[in-house]
UniProtKB/Swiss-Prot annotation:
This reaction introduces a second double bond into the aromatic ring system. One of its GO terms (molecular function) is chorismate synthase activity. This is Chorismate synthase. Belongs to the chorismate synthase family. GO terms for biological process: amino acid biosynthetic process; aromatic amino acid family biosynthetic process; chorismate biosynthetic process. It holds the Pfam family Chorismate_synt. It comes from the Bacteria. Disulfide bonds: none annotated. It catalyses: 5-O-(1-carboxyvinyl)-3-phosphoshikimate = chorismate + phosphate. PANTHER family: CHORISMATE SYNTHASE. PROSITE patterns: CHORISMATE_SYNTHASE_1, CHORISMATE_SYNTHASE_2, CHORISMATE_SYNTHASE_3. NADP(+) binds at residues 48, 54.
Length: 365
Protein backbone atom coordinates (compact mmCIF):
# COMPACT_ATOMS: atom_id res chain seq x y z
CA UNK A 1 0.00 0.00 0.00
CA UNK A 2 1.35 3.40 -0.99
CA UNK A 3 0.06 6.82 0.04
CA UNK A 4 0.87 6.53 3.74
CA UNK A 5 3.25 9.51 3.92
CA UNK A 6 2.16 13.16 4.00
CA UNK A 7 4.66 15.91 3.24
CA UNK A 8 8.25 16.03 1.99
CA UNK A 9 10.43 18.25 4.17
CA UNK A 10 8.18 17.55 7.14
CA UNK A 11 7.14 14.01 6.23
CA UNK A 12 4.65 12.09 8.37
CA UNK A 13 4.33 8.35 7.73
CA UNK A 14 1.17 6.90 9.28
CA UNK A 15 0.90 3.24 10.32
CA UNK A 16 -1.49 0.80 12.00
CA UNK A 17 -5.09 -0.40 11.84
CA UNK A 18 -8.20 0.33 13.88
CA UNK A 19 -8.15 -2.99 15.75
CA UNK A 20 -4.43 -3.73 15.61
CA UNK A 21 -2.20 -3.53 18.69
CA UNK A 22 -1.21 0.09 18.01
CA UNK A 23 -1.29 3.00 15.61
CA UNK A 24 1.25 5.75 15.16
CA UNK A 25 3.48 7.78 12.88
CA UNK A 26 7.08 8.59 12.08
CA UNK A 27 7.98 12.25 11.52
CA UNK A 28 10.98 12.98 9.30
CA UNK A 29 12.27 16.54 9.10
CA UNK A 30 11.46 18.11 12.44
CA UNK A 31 14.21 20.68 13.10
CA UNK A 32 16.53 19.87 16.01
CA UNK A 33 16.64 21.68 19.32
CA UNK A 34 12.94 22.11 20.05
CA UNK A 35 11.77 21.09 23.52
CA UNK A 36 9.27 18.26 23.11
CA UNK A 37 7.50 15.87 25.47
CA UNK A 38 4.39 13.71 25.43
CA UNK A 39 2.56 16.48 27.29
CA UNK A 40 3.03 18.81 24.30
CA UNK A 41 1.12 16.33 22.16
CA UNK A 42 -1.42 14.78 24.52
CA UNK A 43 -3.66 17.84 24.78
CA UNK A 44 -4.70 17.71 21.12
CA UNK A 45 -5.14 13.93 21.27
CA UNK A 46 -7.45 14.34 24.25
CA UNK A 47 -9.58 16.76 22.25
CA UNK A 48 -9.94 14.19 19.46
CA UNK A 49 -10.19 10.97 21.42
CA UNK A 50 -13.39 8.87 21.53
CA UNK A 51 -15.67 8.23 24.48
CA UNK A 52 -15.70 11.79 25.81
CA UNK A 53 -19.48 12.38 25.55
CA UNK A 54 -22.71 10.60 24.67
CA UNK A 55 -22.64 12.26 21.26
CA UNK A 56 -19.59 10.35 20.00
CA UNK A 57 -18.49 6.73 19.79
CA UNK A 58 -18.27 5.02 23.18
CA UNK A 59 -15.07 3.20 22.27
CA UNK A 60 -12.95 4.15 25.27
CA UNK A 61 -9.41 4.77 24.09
CA UNK A 62 -7.05 6.85 26.26
CA UNK A 63 -4.92 7.61 23.18
CA UNK A 64 -1.84 8.00 25.37
CA UNK A 65 1.07 8.92 23.12
CA UNK A 66 4.60 7.59 23.56
CA UNK A 67 7.67 9.20 22.00
CA UNK A 68 9.91 6.30 20.95
CA UNK A 69 12.67 8.17 19.13
CA UNK A 70 13.92 11.53 17.92
CA UNK A 71 14.04 13.22 21.33
CA UNK A 72 17.04 13.28 23.67
CA UNK A 73 17.07 15.00 27.05
CA UNK A 74 13.81 16.70 26.17
CA UNK A 75 14.95 18.17 22.83
CA UNK A 76 14.32 17.07 19.25
CA UNK A 77 17.49 15.71 17.68
CA UNK A 78 16.61 16.19 14.01
CA UNK A 79 16.27 12.42 13.57
CA UNK A 80 12.97 10.60 12.91
CA UNK A 81 10.41 11.03 15.68
CA UNK A 82 8.31 7.91 16.22
CA UNK A 83 4.99 8.44 18.02
CA UNK A 84 3.06 5.39 19.24
CA UNK A 85 -0.56 5.17 20.40
CA UNK A 86 -1.69 1.77 21.71
CA UNK A 87 -5.18 0.45 20.95
CA UNK A 88 -6.78 -0.78 24.18
CA UNK A 89 -10.54 -1.08 23.60
CA UNK A 90 -10.99 -3.04 20.37
CA UNK A 91 -14.21 -5.07 20.09
CA UNK A 92 -13.78 -6.99 16.85
CA UNK A 93 -16.75 -9.31 17.48
CA UNK A 94 -19.05 -6.41 16.60
CA UNK A 95 -18.04 -6.86 12.97
CA UNK A 96 -18.75 -10.59 12.64
CA UNK A 97 -21.97 -9.98 10.73
CA UNK A 98 -20.29 -8.03 7.92
CA UNK A 99 -17.42 -10.37 7.07
CA UNK A 100 -18.99 -11.24 3.73
CA UNK A 101 -21.10 -8.14 3.02
CA UNK A 102 -20.31 -4.59 1.96
CA UNK A 103 -21.43 -1.71 4.16
CA UNK A 104 -22.92 1.15 2.11
CA UNK A 105 -20.78 4.28 2.29
CA UNK A 106 -17.71 2.42 3.57
CA UNK A 107 -14.51 1.36 1.82
CA UNK A 108 -15.29 -2.37 2.07
CA UNK A 109 -16.10 -2.79 -1.62
CA UNK A 110 -13.23 -0.68 -2.95
CA UNK A 111 -10.58 -2.14 -0.62
CA UNK A 112 -11.53 -5.69 -1.63
CA UNK A 113 -11.35 -4.87 -5.32
CA UNK A 114 -8.03 -3.03 -4.95
CA UNK A 115 -6.15 -5.39 -2.60
CA UNK A 116 -8.01 -8.68 -2.98
CA UNK A 117 -8.78 -8.78 0.75
CA UNK A 118 -9.92 -6.44 3.50
CA UNK A 119 -9.79 -6.06 7.26
CA UNK A 120 -13.41 -5.73 8.40
CA UNK A 121 -12.56 -4.94 12.04
CA UNK A 122 -13.49 -1.31 12.49
CA UNK A 123 -12.61 -0.59 8.88
CA UNK A 124 -8.97 -1.60 9.35
CA UNK A 125 -6.69 0.84 7.59
CA UNK A 126 -9.60 2.95 6.31
CA UNK A 127 -10.80 3.77 9.84
CA UNK A 128 -10.95 7.35 11.11
CA UNK A 129 -8.95 6.06 14.06
CA UNK A 130 -5.90 6.59 11.86
CA UNK A 131 -6.41 10.35 12.20
CA UNK A 132 -5.06 10.17 15.76
CA UNK A 133 -1.40 9.90 14.64
CA UNK A 134 -1.93 12.88 12.34
CA UNK A 135 -3.25 14.91 15.27
CA UNK A 136 -0.12 13.92 17.20
CA UNK A 137 2.15 14.98 14.33
CA UNK A 138 0.15 18.18 13.94
CA UNK A 139 0.80 19.04 17.58
CA UNK A 140 4.54 18.87 16.91
CA UNK A 141 4.15 21.16 13.89
CA UNK A 142 1.96 23.57 15.86
CA UNK A 143 4.60 23.88 18.58
CA UNK A 144 7.42 24.64 16.16
CA UNK A 145 5.36 27.15 14.18
CA UNK A 146 4.23 28.96 17.30
CA UNK A 147 7.75 29.23 18.67
CA UNK A 148 9.17 30.34 15.31
CA UNK A 149 6.45 32.66 13.98
CA UNK A 150 3.75 32.92 16.64
CA UNK A 151 1.39 30.98 14.37
CA UNK A 152 -1.76 29.62 16.03
CA UNK A 153 -4.49 27.25 14.88
CA UNK A 154 -8.14 27.24 15.94
CA UNK A 155 -11.20 25.38 14.73
CA UNK A 156 -14.90 25.14 15.46
CA UNK A 157 -18.12 23.50 14.36
CA UNK A 158 -20.03 25.79 11.99
CA UNK A 159 -22.93 23.48 11.14
CA UNK A 160 -24.16 20.06 12.22
CA UNK A 161 -26.78 18.49 10.00
CA UNK A 162 -29.44 21.12 9.34
CA UNK A 163 -28.44 23.12 12.42
CA UNK A 164 -26.45 26.25 11.59
CA UNK A 165 -24.18 27.40 14.42
CA UNK A 166 -23.61 31.17 14.64
CA UNK A 167 -20.16 32.31 15.69
CA UNK A 168 -20.16 33.98 19.13
CA UNK A 169 -16.67 33.50 20.54
CA UNK A 170 -13.66 31.20 20.32
CA UNK A 171 -13.81 30.98 24.11
CA UNK A 172 -16.90 28.76 23.95
CA UNK A 173 -15.31 26.07 21.77
CA UNK A 174 -13.53 24.26 24.60
CA UNK A 175 -16.59 24.32 26.86
CA UNK A 176 -18.87 21.92 24.99
CA UNK A 177 -18.56 18.52 23.27
CA UNK A 178 -19.39 19.93 19.82
CA UNK A 179 -16.50 22.41 19.50
CA UNK A 180 -19.28 24.94 18.93
CA UNK A 181 -18.47 28.67 19.27
CA UNK A 182 -21.70 29.33 21.20
CA UNK A 183 -22.55 29.41 24.90
CA UNK A 184 -25.77 27.38 24.69
CA UNK A 185 -25.63 24.00 22.91
CA UNK A 186 -28.89 22.54 24.23
CA UNK A 187 -30.43 22.61 20.74
CA UNK A 188 -27.46 20.66 19.39
CA UNK A 189 -27.76 18.10 22.19
CA UNK A 190 -31.47 17.63 21.48
CA UNK A 191 -30.77 17.31 17.76
CA UNK A 192 -28.15 14.61 18.29
CA UNK A 193 -30.28 12.71 20.81
CA UNK A 194 -33.17 12.57 18.33
CA UNK A 195 -30.83 11.49 15.56
CA UNK A 196 -29.40 8.64 17.62
CA UNK A 197 -32.88 7.52 18.66
CA UNK A 198 -33.88 7.39 14.99
CA UNK A 199 -30.88 5.19 14.19
CA UNK A 200 -29.49 7.75 11.78
CA UNK A 201 -26.48 10.05 11.38
CA UNK A 202 -25.64 13.48 10.00
CA UNK A 203 -22.83 15.48 8.43
CA UNK A 204 -21.10 18.65 9.55
CA UNK A 205 -19.19 21.72 8.44
CA UNK A 206 -15.96 22.58 10.26
CA UNK A 207 -14.16 25.91 10.16
CA UNK A 208 -10.42 26.05 10.86
CA UNK A 209 -8.26 29.18 11.02
CA UNK A 210 -4.50 29.70 11.11
CA UNK A 211 -3.36 33.11 12.39
CA UNK A 212 0.12 34.61 12.32
CA UNK A 213 1.10 32.83 9.11
CA UNK A 214 4.17 34.40 7.46
CA UNK A 215 3.81 36.06 4.06
CA UNK A 216 5.24 34.07 1.17
CA UNK A 217 4.42 30.44 1.91
CA UNK A 218 3.41 28.39 -1.15
CA UNK A 219 5.03 27.07 -4.32
CA UNK A 220 3.28 27.90 -7.61
CA UNK A 221 2.28 26.39 -9.88
CA UNK A 222 1.37 22.95 -8.60
CA UNK A 223 2.29 23.15 -4.92
CA UNK A 224 0.19 26.20 -4.17
CA UNK A 225 -0.53 26.66 -0.49
CA UNK A 226 -4.28 26.46 -0.99
CA UNK A 227 -3.93 23.44 -3.28
CA UNK A 228 -1.97 21.60 -0.61
CA UNK A 229 -4.51 22.64 2.03
CA UNK A 230 -7.32 21.17 -0.06
CA UNK A 231 -5.26 18.01 -0.64
CA UNK A 232 -4.67 17.64 3.09
CA UNK A 233 -8.28 18.22 4.06
CA UNK A 234 -9.55 15.73 1.49
CA UNK A 235 -7.25 13.18 3.12
CA UNK A 236 -9.36 13.32 6.29
CA UNK A 237 -11.92 10.53 6.51
CA UNK A 238 -15.45 11.47 5.38
CA UNK A 239 -14.51 14.90 3.99
CA UNK A 240 -16.42 15.61 0.76
CA UNK A 241 -15.72 19.28 0.20
CA UNK A 242 -13.21 22.05 0.98
CA UNK A 243 -13.55 25.83 0.85
CA UNK A 244 -10.76 28.40 1.08
CA UNK A 245 -11.89 31.88 2.08
CA UNK A 246 -15.21 32.77 0.48
CA UNK A 247 -15.15 29.43 -1.31
CA UNK A 248 -18.28 28.66 -3.30
CA UNK A 249 -19.79 31.99 -2.27
CA UNK A 250 -17.30 33.50 -4.72
CA UNK A 251 -19.63 32.40 -7.51
CA UNK A 252 -22.22 35.03 -6.60
CA UNK A 253 -19.77 37.76 -5.61
CA UNK A 254 -18.68 40.47 -8.02
CA UNK A 255 -15.13 41.56 -8.60
CA UNK A 256 -15.77 44.80 -6.76
CA UNK A 257 -16.64 42.72 -3.69
CA UNK A 258 -14.41 39.68 -3.91
CA UNK A 259 -11.04 41.33 -4.48
CA UNK A 260 -9.49 42.15 -1.11
CA UNK A 261 -8.47 45.82 -1.17
CA UNK A 262 -5.19 46.83 0.48
CA UNK A 263 -4.36 49.75 2.74
CA UNK A 264 -1.28 50.72 4.77
CA UNK A 265 -3.08 49.19 7.76
CA UNK A 266 -3.61 45.86 6.01
CA UNK A 267 -6.08 44.05 3.79
CA UNK A 268 -9.63 45.34 4.07
CA UNK A 269 -11.28 41.92 3.70
CA UNK A 270 -10.27 38.29 3.39
CA UNK A 271 -12.33 36.66 0.67
CA UNK A 272 -9.13 35.02 -0.56
CA UNK A 273 -8.79 33.15 2.72
CA UNK A 274 -5.20 34.26 3.23
CA UNK A 275 -3.84 33.00 -0.11
CA UNK A 276 -3.21 34.86 -3.40
CA UNK A 277 -1.60 33.14 -6.37
CA UNK A 278 -1.03 30.11 -4.19
CA UNK A 279 1.10 32.15 -1.74
CA UNK A 280 0.17 33.21 1.79
CA UNK A 281 -0.68 36.89 2.29
CA UNK A 282 -0.08 36.97 6.03
CA UNK A 283 -3.81 37.16 6.69
CA UNK A 284 -5.61 34.36 8.51
CA UNK A 285 -5.84 31.15 6.55
CA UNK A 286 -9.60 30.49 6.46
CA UNK A 287 -10.66 26.94 5.62
CA UNK A 288 -13.99 25.11 5.82
CA UNK A 289 -14.61 21.42 5.24
CA UNK A 290 -17.80 19.47 4.61
CA UNK A 291 -18.08 16.07 6.28
CA UNK A 292 -20.55 13.43 5.15
CA UNK A 293 -22.95 11.60 7.50
CA UNK A 294 -21.51 8.61 9.34
CA UNK A 295 -21.97 5.51 7.18
CA UNK A 296 -22.27 3.10 10.15
CA UNK A 297 -25.89 3.31 11.31
CA UNK A 298 -28.28 0.75 12.82
CA UNK A 299 -30.99 1.35 10.21
CA UNK A 300 -31.10 -1.63 7.80
CA UNK A 301 -29.81 -0.88 4.29
CA UNK A 302 -29.57 -2.79 1.06
CA UNK A 303 -26.25 -4.07 -0.23
CA UNK A 304 -24.63 -7.18 -1.69
CA UNK A 305 -22.37 -9.90 -0.34
CA UNK A 306 -18.97 -10.92 -1.69
CA UNK A 307 -20.66 -13.33 -4.08
CA UNK A 308 -22.75 -10.52 -5.55
CA UNK A 309 -26.03 -11.62 -3.98
CA UNK A 310 -28.49 -9.14 -2.43
CA UNK A 311 -27.95 -8.62 1.29
CA UNK A 312 -29.29 -6.47 4.09
CA UNK A 313 -26.75 -4.70 6.28
CA UNK A 314 -27.31 -3.61 9.87
CA UNK A 315 -24.17 -2.06 11.34
CA UNK A 316 -23.48 -2.90 14.97
CA UNK A 317 -20.68 -1.57 17.12
CA UNK A 318 -19.79 1.79 18.63
CA UNK A 319 -19.88 4.59 16.10
CA UNK A 320 -20.06 8.38 15.99
CA UNK A 321 -23.54 9.58 14.97
CA UNK A 322 -21.67 12.55 13.50
CA UNK A 323 -17.99 12.06 12.75
CA UNK A 324 -17.71 15.81 12.33
CA UNK A 325 -17.93 16.33 16.10
CA UNK A 326 -14.36 15.10 16.59
CA UNK A 327 -13.03 16.48 13.30
CA UNK A 328 -12.05 19.94 14.54
CA UNK A 329 -8.65 18.98 16.05
CA UNK A 330 -8.01 16.77 13.01
CA UNK A 331 -8.55 19.66 10.59
CA UNK A 332 -6.36 21.91 12.74
CA UNK A 333 -3.60 19.29 12.64
CA UNK A 334 -3.72 18.83 8.88
CA UNK A 335 -3.61 22.60 8.33
CA UNK A 336 -0.62 22.82 10.67
CA UNK A 337 1.19 20.08 8.74
CA UNK A 338 0.69 21.97 5.48
CA UNK A 339 1.92 25.26 6.94
CA UNK A 340 4.89 23.48 8.52
CA UNK A 341 5.86 21.90 5.21
CA UNK A 342 5.74 25.23 3.39
CA UNK A 343 7.52 27.09 6.18
CA UNK A 344 10.46 24.69 5.87
CA UNK A 345 10.41 25.05 2.07
CA UNK A 346 10.42 28.83 2.34
CA UNK A 347 13.30 28.75 4.79
CA UNK A 348 15.30 26.45 2.52
CA UNK A 349 14.61 28.11 -0.85
CA UNK A 350 13.85 31.77 -0.17
CA UNK A 351 15.19 32.38 3.31
CA UNK A 352 17.62 35.06 2.08
CA UNK A 353 15.04 37.03 0.05
CA UNK A 354 14.67 40.66 1.18
CA UNK A 355 11.98 43.08 -0.01
CA UNK A 356 11.50 46.78 0.75
CA UNK A 357 7.69 46.67 0.64
CA UNK A 358 6.41 46.41 4.22
CA UNK A 359 4.58 43.36 5.47
CA UNK A 360 1.28 45.14 6.06
CA UNK A 361 -0.17 42.35 8.16
CA UNK A 362 2.84 42.27 10.49
CA UNK A 363 3.01 46.07 10.69
CA UNK A 364 -0.50 46.16 12.13
CA UNK A 365 0.64 44.86 15.30
Amino acid sequence: MSGNTFGNLFAVTNFGESHGPAIGCVIDGCPPGMALSEADIQGDLDRRRPGTSRHVTQRNEPDAVEILSGVYEGKTTGTPICLLIKNTDQRSKDYGNILDTFRPGHADYTYLHKYGLRDPRGGGRSSARLTAPMVAAGAVAKKWLFEKYGTTFRGCMAQIGEAMIPFESWEHVANNPFFAPVADVSNLENYMDALRKAGDSCGARIRVVASGVPVGLGEPLFDKLDADIAFAMMGINAVKGVEIGAGFASVTQRGTTHGDSLSPEGFMSNNAGGVLGGISTGQDLEVSIAIKPTSSIITPRQSIDTAGNPAEVVTKGRHDPCVGIRATPIAEAMLALVVMEHALRQRAQCGDVKVSTPDIMRSRG
